Amino acid sequence: MRQPARTTIITLWGALITALALALSITAPAVAIDPGGREEALPTPPPPKPSVPSVGTTALSDGTPVGIVVAGGDGGMLHIVDLSTRTLRSRERLAPENTDVQPWEFARLSNRHVLLASGGGQLFEIDPDAPEGKKATNLSDPSRPGYEQVAAYSKFLWDVVVDEHDRVYVATQSDRGGHILRYDPSANQGRGQWTDLLPGGVQAGQTEVRSLAYDNGFLYAGTGTKTLSIVRINTSTNAATKLSVPSHVTAGLGHLERLQVKAGNLYVGTNVPGNVRPTCGGTCVLDPATGAQKMKDGKPIELDTWSSQVVTRPGEAEKVYYTVQSANTPTLQEYDPRTNTSRTLAEGLASTARPSQSSWATHDHFISAGKDDGSIAIVHASDRSAADLPKDANGSNGIRGSLRSIQSLTAVPGGDLYASWYMTTPMLLRTTPNAQVDKTQYSLTTAPLGQVEGFGHSSKWFVTGIYPSGELVTYEMGANGPRMEHPRSVKITTDASQVRPYTIVPIDADRFAVGTTPMGKNGSGALSIYDAARNEISTYPLDDIAYADPSLRGSLSNRRPLSIVHHKDKLYVGTSASGDGMNAAQTEAAAPRLFEFDVKTKQVTRVMTPFKDQRSITALTSGSDGTLYGTTGMHVFTVNPTDFTIGRSRALTRQGYADANRSQMIERDGVLYAIMAGRLRALSTSLQDDGTVIADFVNTPQGKVYVNSLTLGADRNLYYARGATIYRYTFPAG
């Protein structure tokens, strides 16, 4: 009888010890994982070809006419071009490192200084006579009176014009609507003054003002992305009138990119991408007071400008100018509205060079530039000649590209990395890492023009997703990486409604799942299945995708797929919140979704809302054991595919945030590596702690530079980018 009693006591002690151990495991703080690696910056990569969307002109203090050519990118590259001798006078960085410079349009002040409206949200004033390093001043600065009151409206600047009083008008884009900002450089004893010309925005519900034109006290603004309008504003009273523009003028356009006004004519660019003749041949001529189409001999006036901007010329009261291919020869054309005729002013311009609103420096000197290759065309009207800048032994005309922020990054079999940049370019960056970081090798490889939003690859294919053309460009995969010689392309949709192929995930050796989004922030995205072997694509817009359960119909509408993972003939897709993706309401109806798509039946089989208060499911990945992981930027979680439920979950309430943009997540040897809130974080797959930040964002005077574009190299190290630099996180040996 005594033995059983002893056994009972031992059993009770064991139970007590087990209970204590369990309690400690629950209450004791988990130790954050530390991979023990180190971060290394790879050498500075070569820049891509120059991005020159526009050019400016002015004269030096000695009267020399010059072109102001800025290559966009990280800090930008400022070139001063002598238009008389057709030579490059100087070249220097425009702005400090980590300044996003996108030179969309220029205008000239009466003091010969040039203004640059940058897509990075800055208005620069450039003095070409100033010493090196002192030529550019950023006027979009809190030290300028009124700027802090308008800063929220100036996230992106599209256009700039100047009136006869040197007052500056800037077209902007922002989440708070499209605005026109006015800057008066002479106010406040030369410190300037910023104001919002039309408080509340120019057009309700539209996020951008894309184009401006000014003449004789009236400002004209092309606004909208879904509903396009032209607004006429009296700059003395700020009274605004919407013009009655014929519907066919704006039909099919995503923006009103080009306006010009001269001598009682309002020129409106209408070019729609494609090979068909655009409305009015590219430019419609309207009455600037009413919006009615101008007529000549009973017929509408039309200019065959195709995609060219119509520009004015000093000393010409009525004529306007544009460039166009004539008999396969690039020409500069002069249009006289009095006779409704055009004549060739010069031939032999660079084929890609396009005019800007201030291309004419004088009545004799004209300059235009190629947006994506830096080619230059300088015209001397007096002898009707056109020429580029002199080329060196390497074929360069001296217009040098700027470093640019890395947009996307991937590692391929064989060990190389491929990267793309922010803003379009006809090339990719190939990186060959080395254990000794200073022996890293780079090369620039030719690729179709575009901005690569996403990469995907299998053992047989390398796929790139191109913006703004909305197409996939595919290369065969060789033993040492992709063979770049013979790319093939396919449009995701025939109507170009899906333009950003963000996410490309292999299903098998030949097929890929592709998640795409439309041009604007609003609107539904699409899920596509791409067969690379056949170069065929099937696209399923989320607004009308098929559901296995009819009761789910509509649950994905007005959302965009940002993350995809493939698991056992199913795709698990994470979306944005509905509408603009910001989920201000934080409701079930607006929240982001996670859905399951059957690759065989091409139907959505299950849908869930993991978190009502988040903006998107930014990344999904599959672990080595088949577990599915995801993140929203704040939450990290697992997904149980069997019953389609959320398993483990952890909220990083202190260092995470609900993100609206796609990111990346990788599982390596039982550890999750995810970009969250602009940081690279290592987390245990148990999700028992907040993990460890192994690569943080960097604070600079120009703002934060975030970590992005995470990929796992063939060497099993992590690679990612901050700005224009690629970094490696090297793990300890063994």
Residue ranges and their predicted role:
Residues V66-V70, H113-L116, R167-A171, L219-G222, ...:
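Conserved beta-propeller blade signature
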Residues G73, G120, S174, T225, ...:
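Residue-level signature of beta-propeller blades and closely related beta-rich strand-turn architectures
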